[in-house]
Amino acid sequence: KKTQTSKEAIVERVERHFTWKWGPGEVTLQHNPSFLDNGRVLLFDNGSHRRAPNTNYSRIVEIDPANNDIAWDYRGEPAISFYSYQISGAERQPNGNTLICEGATGRFIEVTAGHQIVWEYINPLFADSGRLAGGSSSGQANSVFRAHRFAPDDPALEGRDLDPARYGNLNRILGAN
C-alpha cells in the first residue's frame, strides 16, 4: 500500500537510512521535488488538507537541507488564487526564474526571484475527466501533469520540425498568431 506522507527526505541507499528529513507538517501532498545546483530542494507544495486556519493554497518552496529553512517561496496573492490540489510542479530555469505548472487548472507561469510573473499560459484544451476533475463541476478539465522548458539548442529538439506554420490550423483554433 502506498501512502502520501507529506514528507521530503534524502535516503542514503547503501546504509538504508535518511540523511535528511523535512516534514510532516511543513508541506502537504507535495510534488516534483528536485535538487538545485546550490544544494537546495525545490518542490510544489499542493497544500491539500492543510490544517485551518491556513487552508487551501499552494506554494513553491526552496528548502535548504543544511538548516531546514525555507530559502525562497512563491504563493498567490491572495493565497487561494494559486491552488492546485493535485499534480503540478516547479522547475528552476538557467536565468534564475522558476517555471511553475499549476496542474489542476492547466496554468503555466514563470516567476522571477522577486515573485513577478513574467508570462502566463493557460491550457485551452479541455477533455472529459470525470466528476470534479481539475476542480470542475462539469467533469471537463484542462489539467496538465507537469511542464518542462527546453532550451532552443536542447539535443531532444535536434532534427525536429518546429516551424509554427506547420501547425497553422491548430494555432488558429487555439487563438495563437
Where are these regions (language model features)?
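Histidine-/acidic-rich catalytic cores in large beta-rich domains
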Residues: 1-177
